[in-house]
Amino acid sequence: MIQVLLVTICLAVFPYQGSSIILESGNVNDYEVVYPRKVTALPKGAVQQKYEDAMQYEFTVNGEPVVLHLEKNKGLFSEDYSETHYSPDGREITTNPPVEDHCYYHGRIQNDADLTASISACDGLKGHFKLQGETYIIEPLKLPDSEAHAVFKYENVEKEDEAPKMCGVTQSNWESDESIKEDSQSNLTPAQQKYLNAKKYVKFFLVADHIMYLKYGRNLTTLRTRMFDTVNIVNQILQRINIHVALIGIEIWSKEDKIIVQSVPDVTLKLFATWRESVLLKRKNHDNAHLLTGINFNGPTAGLAYLGGICKPMYSAGIVQDHNKIHHLVAIAMAHEMGHNLGMDHDKDTCTCRAKACVMAGTLSCDASYLFSDCSRQEHRAFLIKNMPQCILKKPLKTDVVSPPVCGNYFVEVGEDCDCGSPATCRDPCCDAATCKLRQGAQCAEGLCCDQCRFKAAGTECRAATDECDMADLCTGRSAECTDRFQRNGQPCQNNNGYCYNRTCPTMNNQCIALFGPNAAVSQDACFQFNRQGNYYGYCRKEQNTKIACEPQNVKCGRLYCIDSSPAKKNPCNIIYSPNDEDKGMVLPGTKCADGMACNSNGQCVDVNRTY
């Protein structure tokens, strides 16, 4: 059995309180000096790691003893993590450095179950923790031949710019509070409930622009550490809504910027999102990317992101200004913008969390917390129910993982039976969190065919059919997995008004109802002739952002035209068009376009047997 190493470090408080000192976090007016003394007790035969899996720090703050428990953030990096920078002559240099034994930790104060600490132990101890509602920062003093560290309150750091920073999202066109409440509390379909219950992962890519490279002294290691410190906190914040953020790669524009980074945030966001879609996604598959920039945005803006953009090639992006020396404030801004990508709007005055300010507050203050408000949680849930973004459901298979397995990162890898997180957070009675092996007598730890650590009997229904294109799924009695079965693509459905396509029955009528409401229906054929125009209200596909007009036989595979029979809406040729998502309102692939014909993913009406 693998034993988790516990390291105890006593921090002796130096009998001195400083009045003012310049530290990495800025000019600090009041601080305490502490000296870490490390005491290690390795189990017999244990392998010494450079950075232990678990550590405990004991020290004194304002004369009161504090015990800080830390555990390595094992889910911080993805298994195929990569780093890219550029040589002086502009050559792209990409490496896959080992990241299993890293130095980034999450933690908590003893007798407080809430995770309130984020610490890096790479070069001394640097990070922050919360104690009795106050945010404290610890960092090395960098004195010659000394282990001295400073501990101080965030409020004692002199602020370079007292003007509060804000998010640039100002007009969301989001649903009303009532509709969100109805969506999140309404009866869910089996497919929606299955989606909500599934674990979710964001494979995250972070880019630093050239100004960041210059700002951190042209030192790749220093900038890399800044990026890691920031994402470590973002990961911790998003875990509160059951989103695991795995850093899949970083890129540093060390030679020059790959876009024109401007002080106008919406222009920079659009340029970055376009570069991500056209360049980065083709090079590195990921779910979401942000640009960390050293430029000062116009006004008080600290960041900007597309609302509800997650999983969309053009819109799963955000930009964040490196606006403060204290990285946890930059991390909160980044988590805020990712919150927008995940469907959350700004908090209103009526929104609450167990803190003075919640993550999605429109203004970033020194009271910023890691907590999402009741409104944010409701909006996020409603967004997931309505859109069910698929990319965040994907986690790697054992055979996909090429790096050594890391027990505790929530990914079941080669050599592991289960992975329920760290020993402190695991609540799975079937899984031994220390070894990632099943406990004695257990056959399984998770899966729809697993019940109280045992396989369900053969023939047990594990998933009901959701519609006529689905099939009831049965347990085999030999596995915890519930194999997903469904009707073959092309099977007629809904009284021959459609054909099954990837377990759904897409029809134009149902798509109109989803877009315009229960009184909507598909328009007459004449409306679809607009798809021969090749402009925003009528096209079949795009090539390099150019809209391609439909051929006559393909007009029903372009923009969807609907008629709304409501008294106030009598336009017979209604469409949905959004400049932020031009493909919204297009006829979905697999939709019936004629007898025996269905739309393919290229906007063509082809024989139903060739569509798939």
Swiss-Prot record:
Binding residues for Zn(2+): 336, 340, 346
Propeptide section residues: 21-188
Catalytic residues of the enzyme: 337
Enzyme category, top tier: hydrolase
GO terms, molecular function: metal ion binding; metalloendopeptidase activity; peptidase activator activity; toxin activity
Tissue spec. comment: Expressed by the venom gland.
Cysteine-cysteine disulfides: 311-391, 351-375, 353-358, 407-436, 418-431, 420-426, 430-453, 444-450, 449-475, 462-482, 469-500, 493-505, 512-562, 527-573, 540-550, 557-599, 593-605
Family stated for the protein in its record: Belongs to the venom metalloproteinase (M12B) family. P-III subfamily. P-IIIc sub-subfamily.
Name of the protein described by the UniProt record: Zinc metalloproteinase-disintegrin-like HV1
